[in-house]
């Protein structure tokens, strides 16, 4: 017969052997001391269970396969991008331009033309037309890519591009590609289109990073035209039979040197996923003319839980510090942490007009409850918050003083700022910013302003529910 005491001692030793180094990892590597404390307490209470949870959800870093396989620069998309300070950037934004350049290691590019595409009604036809026009290559990355409705049209367009000889690569985040029954991943495979899923959740070596997702939306045609923004390929954003019921979003078409930053981002993600390094020939011949396409100075910002950690946070906080007159934030999820709350409040207290526009009808109730639990912390310092009624609004945009804007995939929540791979573009262009301010103002004017008094007047049960949801903001 086995000795119960011996088994107990063995189990205790195993628990300690696992729990002690796990707790040590949390103490050394977790950046937030409150987070480290909570993990250590959980591991102390549940040595094996807490250690397992920490291994799955507590290690928020991702080892880049692309960096390991190909540490050198790819001449197709990686040129000398040491940050420089163009004279075209006005003095109030020189510090911000320097900050983002230091954070990203990329220079501002001139001569870009950036065009906003409002909702699926404008974005999807423009993207489909670009795919149909592709001569050399199509590179598409999407967080969600449905196979039905508008997604079926994209699958067909990609299949036709592949069949006429263009090189096509499609990258979809694994969670949505593998676990959604309507994902386009299998439809693309059946059509013979080269497709892959980012960070597969079924690979044991990557289980610790299963919650780190690729939220980027990129489309590059022939290395000349790019699209990025907040738009997934998803039927709720395409309702030609009832356009008033379609969800809202903002996407952008880009031409000019900044498209190389989209190419670089896709190249790294594709190589990281498949091991295939896209060569210079993949993108086709460079444009025959070097004439400038437009007047925007722009720079791509890759951010994620790898070497690019915190780039988006630094950009947002730097922009808030640079603001002199106005800050407009358009986001589907407004769940800022304490440093971001302090930066927003500081800007408002300096006399800057700070406005936040977010949907009244969210697609994730828990996130919306947590967001409303944060409202009072910025409202009391002069930040104004507006909730847009009607269909869900997935738009993502930041505007400063009518001169600078930041567009792309990132939200104002912990998942975008720390856990997801995101891609944004910062743009210095008064004309574009003015146009985008008009879009923001129109949506804001159709929205309801939230007051601190109204928040306090809500039933206690609702406030408790929201407060409990707020406890989970680090992972929402």
Predicted regions located by residue number:
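Active-site donor-binding acidic/aromatic loop of nucleotide-activated sugar
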Residues: 385-389
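Catalytic-core elements of nucleic-acid end-processing and repair enzymes
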Residues: 396
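N-terminal localization/anchoring segments of enzymes in phospholipid and broader phosphate metabolism
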Residues: 1-314, 318, 322, 346, ...
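Helical hairpin unit composed of two closely spaced alpha helices linked by a short loop
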Residues: 323, 333-355, 359-360, 364
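Active-site-proximal loop->helix
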Residues: 368-369
């Amino acid at each position: 017969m086995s000795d119960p005491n011996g088994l107990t001692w063995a189990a205790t030793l195993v628990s300690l052997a696992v729990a002690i180094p796990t707790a040590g990892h949390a103490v050394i590597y977790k950046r937030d001391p409150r987070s480290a404390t909570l993990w250590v307490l959980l591991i102390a209470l549940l040595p094996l269970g807490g250690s397992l949870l920490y291994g799955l959800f507590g290690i928020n870093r991702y080892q880049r396969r692309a960096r390991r396989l190909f540490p050198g620069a790819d001449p197709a998309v990686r040129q000398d991008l040491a940050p420089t300070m163009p004279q075209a950037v006005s003095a109030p934004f020189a510090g911000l331009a320097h900050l983002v350049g230091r954070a990203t290691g990329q220079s501002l590019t001139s001569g870009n033309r950036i065009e906003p595409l409002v909702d699926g009604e404008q974005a999807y036809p423009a993207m489909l037309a670009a795919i149909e026009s592709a001569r050399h290559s199509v590179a598409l990355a999407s967080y969600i890519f449905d196979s039905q409705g508008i997604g079926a049209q994209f699958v067909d367009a990609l299949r036709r591009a592949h069949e006429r000889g263009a090189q096509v690569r499609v990258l979809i985040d694994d969670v949505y590609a593998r676990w959604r029954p309507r994902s386009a991943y299998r439809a693309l495979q059946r059509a013979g289109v080269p497709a892959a899923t980012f960070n597969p959740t079924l690979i044991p070596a990557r289980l610790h990073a299963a919650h780190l997702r690729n939220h980027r939306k990129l489309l590059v045609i022939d290395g000349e035209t790019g699209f990025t923004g907040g738009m997934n390929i998803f039927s709720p954003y395409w309702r030609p039979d009832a356009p008033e019921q379609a969800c809202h979003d903002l996407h952008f078409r880009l031409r000019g040197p900044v498209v190389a930053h989209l190419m670089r981002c896709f190249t790294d993600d594709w190589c990281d996923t498949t091991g295939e390094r896209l060569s210079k020939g993949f993108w086709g011949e460079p444009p025959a003319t070097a004439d400038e396409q437009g007047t925007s100075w722009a720079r791509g910002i890759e951010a994620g839980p790898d070497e690019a950690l915190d780039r988006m946070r630094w950009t947002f906080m730097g922009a808030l510090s640079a603001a002199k007159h106005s800050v407009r934030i358009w986001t589907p999820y407004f769940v800022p942490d304490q440093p971001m709350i302090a930066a927003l409040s500081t800007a408002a207290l300096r006399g800057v007009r700070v406005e936040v526009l977010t949907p009244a009808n969210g697609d994730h109730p828990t996130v919306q409850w947590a967001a409303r639990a944060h409202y009072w912390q910025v409202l009391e310092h002069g930040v104004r918050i507006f909730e847009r009624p009607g269909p869900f609004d997935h738009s993502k945009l930041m505007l400063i003083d009518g001169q600078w804007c930041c567009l792309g995939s990132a939200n104002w929540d912990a998942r975008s700022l720390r856990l997801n791979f995101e891609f944004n573009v910062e743009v210095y262009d008064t004309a574009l910013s003015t146009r985008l301010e008009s879009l923001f103002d129109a949506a804001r004017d159709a929205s309801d302003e939230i007051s601190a008094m109204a928040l306090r007047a809500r039933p206690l049960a609702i406030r408790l529910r929201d407060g409990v949801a707020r406890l989970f903001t680090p992972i929402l």
